[in-house]
Amino acid sequence: MSMLKRIAAALTALASAAVLGDITGTITTENGMAQKGVIRWSTRDKAYAVAKGNTEIQIKPSEVAEIEIDKPAGYDEAVAQVQKGQGAAAIPALRKIAETYRHLQWDKRAGRYLAEAYLETGKANDGLRACEAVIDDDASAAYMGDLAPAYWRALLALGRKAKLEAQLEKAAKSGDRFSAGAALTMRGDIILKEGAESSDAAKKALTDGYLRVVFLYNDPEIAGRLLPEALYKAAHCFEKLGQSGRADAMRTQIRRDYAASPWAAK
């Protein structure tokens, strides 16, 4: 990112912070000290600043064991809008949160839903830029964590297959089970798109993508984040193959086990 872009991003974040108010949370350092207070990211010093009363301390990223930032106002409402298919209405709030919480945990989470909102409204380029704003600060966000699947969907929508494949390979090797499972779901999406949703493509998407997630990622720690989408997309493929009974079984499992998931509402 150029110096001018960094300055512009910092100024935007400051302006947004004035609207959203102080950002509060707790940073736990590698030596076990918990520093709680008003937290900001210093672009100049490339460090976290924690203000407590009239004092402010700096903590380098290398010293951080865990960071827990309080949820931004309006975040849940904006996410709910995206999940209900009202992405356009959520874009301003999510964009403000992503800018204000740069380096502060919620930039990735808001960036994910911001990208999904743009994709939902047919603005894949804007979705890609929303992801890249976060990835510029943390390259691992391109293949690991909450933002990555939205980034992959933007790349798929724009036909950026070489870049997409590179990120999926990294996800598979990352050691992070969510990312590896999400990469398999994306494999299914790629196969379906390239095969124009033909019967052959549906079969391959099931065996190489969705069903692998269903059977290999059903442990309680990760299933809730991966299975609803994989089950939904597997049901779609079974419908394509004329196997309505198996499709219904997938949908029943979503409604039974993941009733709170937006995929259950679909």
Report each predicted region and the residues it spans.
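Single-residue signature of alpha-solenoid repeat helices
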Residues: 90, 127, 164, 202, ...
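Hydrophobic/aromatic packing residues within the alpha-helices of TPR/SEL1-like helical repeat arrays
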Residues: 94, 131, 168, 206, ...
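Compositionally biased alpha-helical segments
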Residues: 20-136, 149, 186, 196-201, ...
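Bacterial N-terminal signal peptides
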Residues: 8-17
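Bacterial N-terminal signal peptides that target proteins for export
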Residues: 1-9
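Short solvent-exposed coil/turn linkers within tandem alpha-helical repeat scaffolds
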Residues: 55-58, 97-109, 135-147, 158, ...
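Eukaryotic tandem repeat interaction scaffolds
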Residues: 153-196
